[in-house]
Amino acid sequence: MVPVLHSLSTIILIAEFVWGNLSNGLIVLKNCIDWINKKELSTVDQILIVLAISRISLIWETLIIWVKDQLISSITIEELKIIVFSFILSSHFSLWLATALSIFYLFRIPNCYWQIFLYLKWRIKQLIVHMLLGSLVFLVANMIQITITLEERFYQYGGNTSVNSMETEFSILIELMLFNMTMFSIIPFSLALISFLLLIFSLWKHLQKMPLNSRGDRDPSATAHRNALRILVSFLLLYTIYFLSLLISWVAQKNQSELVHIICMITSLVYPSFHSYILILGNYKLKQTSLWVMRQLGCRMKRQNTPTT
């Protein structure tokens, strides 16, 4: 690849890496401080903490995979297992926790009086816990399949860990990992999509009941609907881009197209980095904290640039 393009892509990757760690780190830090001070934390804040931690892990794992891909000859089988399992773990919880957040918005925002809806609404915490525990079945199945495939291939090579065999193993694992991601992502992605459609329906029903002169920014219910829809749309769109970028990256790697592979790696980091920024903008507490941090940084930079007399 042209050195200029390689340098530019490296700068963008580093910028996304820093941005993702800062935005997710802000979510974790602010909510942990509130947890310590108030001795309690709301359900949505608990979800945000674990979601942010999983995304920090996902950002690091994506970067490690990119670096190790450049140094494939130096990877051992055990290192390959750790990298793949860590990526699967962080990707799994990042997706399912975002889905849990979507379901939380669905049951908390709309004013619906169906019996089944009210029953689940008052048990939303138990519903989310059971959903996340149930998702562990898919996680374990995914890891077992990866382990069996890796052990079979390693046995087939007779313990050979040459460069060619490692490149073959890496390609096979990426292919299997992407296939499993496709299959195991169908349920959480569908749940998030259903939540999005039901929120649109709820907003439409709400606007139908409201008089025309009341349909504005002063309507708290409509504002909450729009905020939740903004978060869900960004999640669905960014996760789709994230998955497609991984798929195209794998194809580019097989065809030895380094430029396309690098572009896809850059694109894949947009999901865990920038969706958290959208979550911050949609959360009043986190938004105010981020503005305070930016003001403090601005004041400090201004003081440093002001010449002393």
Curated annotation (Swiss-Prot):
Q: How does it sit in the membrane?
A: Multi-pass membrane protein
Q: Where are the transmembrane segments?
A: 8-28, 47-67, 87-107, 128-148, 184-204, 231-251, 262-282
The protein's superkingdom reads Eukaryota
- Which InterPro entries is this protein grouped with? TAS2R
Q: Which residues are glycosylated?
A: N160, N180, N255
- One Gene Ontology molecular-function label: G protein-coupled receptor activity
User: Per UniProt, which keywords does this protein have?
Assistant: G-protein coupled receptor, Glycoprotein, Membrane, Receptor, Sensory transduction, Taste, Transducer, Transmembrane, Transmembrane helix
- What compartments host this protein? Membrane
Pfam families hit by this protein: TAS2R (PF05296)
* Extracellular side, ranges: 1-7, 68-86, 149-183, 252-261
Could you state one GO cellular component term attached to this entry? membrane
Chain ranges sitting on the Cytoplasmic side read 29-46, 108-127, 205-230, 283-309
**Misc. comment:** Several bitter taste receptors are expressed in a single taste receptor cell.
Concerning its family, UniProt says: Belongs to the G-protein coupled receptor T2R family.
Its function, per the record, reads: Putative taste receptor which may play a role in the perception of bitterness.
Name the UniProt record assigns to this protein: Taste receptor type 2 member 124
User: Native species of this protein?
Assistant: Mus musculus
Q: What is the lineage of its organism?
A: Eukaryota, Metazoa, Chordata, Craniata, Vertebrata
